[in-house]
């Protein structure tokens, strides 16, 4: 007789809101799942009636982590509605901010937010620092991959253990049966975790210098950016500041290529089973990003759509406002706590809350369920990777092949495209995405320098909001967690309606109008769970989508009502 249990992991929190995952586990395997966003956003209602020029400043408050991306995509939506042109200098500056923000996001996710799902901190005490340094020879030239550095890190870990307080490493699933890294790899990972804390500061320095501060940048405007350019002035974007940005980019490049890329390959090498777990629908959607002209028509990063995991079905998306994309998006509230059940296009979308309590077969989430031509779609770095490989995009293919080469050198095995439809495939996709946008960050810096050298200092074109009439616009972007879109209706100079379809909506959504599971839900079906009170395996896959994390999760045993507190790192 089969044994069935239900667990509730609540909350797995993210900055956009709080996430609850419910699972039914039968004979040690997840057989059913529900993904529930447990906090209502409602930001769309806040901007109704507001001046469209203020929307970006308000909408970036949706999130405390992805602030920058919401600001930029909101500006694009209003600019699209009124037909505003953007000077190329402004595009370059926006792109540098977006790229640096995305690099910061990816580094923080891999090391600070998800690495502890795979790394046993205490096992690092058993490592041989000399052996750890030798393991990386031939795959990395990072200067801090030395026995002395690893020995110092080991001493720090020992001091934490001896104090009885593990600090930032407290409350992990250390000793869990699913932890498989050798002691030396655990030590390497902890060392790189600590080094990443310093490295990610360089990415934030770029955002803060160009955006005036971070989080919540201040330099945007409809029609450009508020960054006066004068190479000889002390108070604006000058030669000194631009060279400071270049120094930050150079340091980021070294860390990303010699540490981050290698570590992702190492994780894949030691956890091969996670190259077969975590698959969703196989439908992937991404949009082009990093515009380099005033009309938002030429981009440095390609987009596209892949269906059923078959790269031969790839359809390129060359424009952010491709009619194929705009017409395909609808959101359903059938299983969400809103009044309107039928799928609606975002311009007509309504945000009318209707809380009913949890209903397995009814409404159970504050997140709506987006579909693309009626299909469940995954967005994010894996979607970017699959579309980039299908398009034979040069930077995507190049960086993937480098990571693949490291994996094959470590294992002697071939990393196939079919294995990418997985939990670790998602992490590999994020790594490749980070490498590609780091190249773009460097290129955008050079393009800005070259354009200034030609005498072009323009960064803003004054644009008025029409006082009369109705205008509709949409801003798209390919941001760290995937395709983001903001949809605005402007009437008589004010915002009539506003909807944001965020990456987390696509991936964390509940069942749709056809009762099809969302990506989070699909991804954990078939996942083995060794210990229901420590559901590390479920958390690994959910974290691979890059939700921000909570420090405390509660697992409820419905058989006896016992609540077991579980700390998630």
Give the residues covered by each predicted segment.
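Catalytic-core signal marking the mid-to-C-terminal active-site face
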Residues: 496
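A translation/RNA-centric and nucleic-acid-associated enzymatic feature enriched
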Residues: 486-491
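Active-site bordering "gate/hinge" segments
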Residues: 1-481, 492, 502-569
């Amino acid at each position: 007789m089969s044994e069935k249990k239900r667990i509730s992991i609540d909350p797995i929190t993210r900055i956009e809101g709080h996430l609850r995952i419910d699972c039914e586990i039968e004979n040690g395997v997840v057989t059913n799942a529900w993904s529930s966003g447990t906090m209502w956003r409602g930001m769309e209602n806040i901007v109704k009636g507001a001046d469209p020029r203020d929307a970006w400043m308000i909408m970036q408050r949706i999130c405390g982590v992805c602030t920058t991306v919401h600001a930029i995509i909101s500006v694009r939506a209003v600019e699209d509605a009124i037909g505003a042109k953007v000077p190329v200098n402004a595009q370059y500056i926006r792109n540098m901010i977006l790229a640096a923000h995305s690099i910061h996001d990816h580094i923080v996710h891999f090391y600070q937010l998800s690495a502890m799902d795979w790394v046993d901190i205490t096992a690092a005490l058993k490592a041989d620092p000399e052996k750890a340094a030798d393991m990386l020879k031939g795959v990395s030239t990072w200067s801090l991959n030395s026995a002395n550095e690893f020995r110092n890190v080991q001493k720090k870990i020992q001091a934490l253990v001896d104090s009885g307080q593990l600090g930032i490493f407290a409350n992990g699933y250390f000793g869990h049966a699913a932890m498989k890294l050798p002691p030396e790899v655990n030590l390497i990972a902890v060392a790189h975790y600590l080094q990443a804390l310093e490295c990610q500061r360089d990415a934030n320095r770029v955002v803060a210098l160009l955006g005036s501060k971070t989080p919540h940048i201040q330099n945007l405007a409809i029609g450009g950016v508020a960054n006066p350019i004068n190479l000889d002035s002390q108070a604006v974007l000058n030669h000194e500041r631009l060279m400071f940005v270049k120094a930050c980019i150079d340091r980021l490049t070294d860390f990303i290529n010699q540490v981050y890329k290698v570590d992702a390959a190492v994780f894949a090498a030691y956890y091969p089973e996670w190259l077969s777990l975590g698959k969703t629908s196989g439908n992937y959607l991404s949009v082009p990003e990093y515009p380099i002209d005033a009309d938002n028509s030429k981009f440095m990063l390609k987009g596209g759509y892949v269906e059923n995991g078959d790269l031969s079905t790839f359809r390129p998306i060359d424009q952010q406002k491709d009619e194929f994309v705009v017409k395909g998006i609808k959101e359903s509230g059938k299983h969400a706590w809103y009044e309107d059940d039928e799928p609606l296009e975002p311009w007509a979308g309504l945000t009318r809350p209707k809380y009913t309590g949890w209903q397995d077969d009814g409404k159970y989430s504050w997140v709506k369920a987006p579909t693309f031509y009626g299909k469940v779609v995954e967005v994010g770095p894996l979607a970017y990777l699959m579309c980039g490989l299908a398009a034979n995009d040069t930077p995507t293919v190049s960086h993937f092949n480098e990571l693949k080469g490291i994996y094959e050198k470590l294992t002697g095995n071939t990393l196939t495209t079919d294995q990418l439809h997985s939990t670790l495939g998602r992490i590999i996709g994020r790594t490749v995405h980070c490498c590609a946008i780091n190249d773009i960050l460097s290129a955008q810096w050079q393009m800005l320098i070259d354009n200034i050298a030609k005498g072009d200092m323009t960064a803003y074109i004054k644009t008025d909001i029409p006082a009369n009439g109705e205008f509709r616009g949409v801003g798209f972007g390919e941001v760290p967690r995937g395709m983001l879109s903001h949809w605005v209706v402007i009437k008589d100079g004010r915002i009539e309606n506003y909807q944001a379809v965020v990456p987390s909506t696509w991936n964390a959504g509940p069942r749709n109008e056809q009762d099809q599971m969302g990506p989070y839900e699909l991804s954990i079906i078939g996942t083995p769970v060794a210990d229901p009170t420590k559901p590390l395996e479920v958390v690994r896959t959910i974290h691979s989508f890059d939700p921000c994390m909570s420090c405390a999760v509660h697992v409820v045993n419905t058989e006896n009502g016992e609540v077991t507190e579980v700390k998630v790192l």
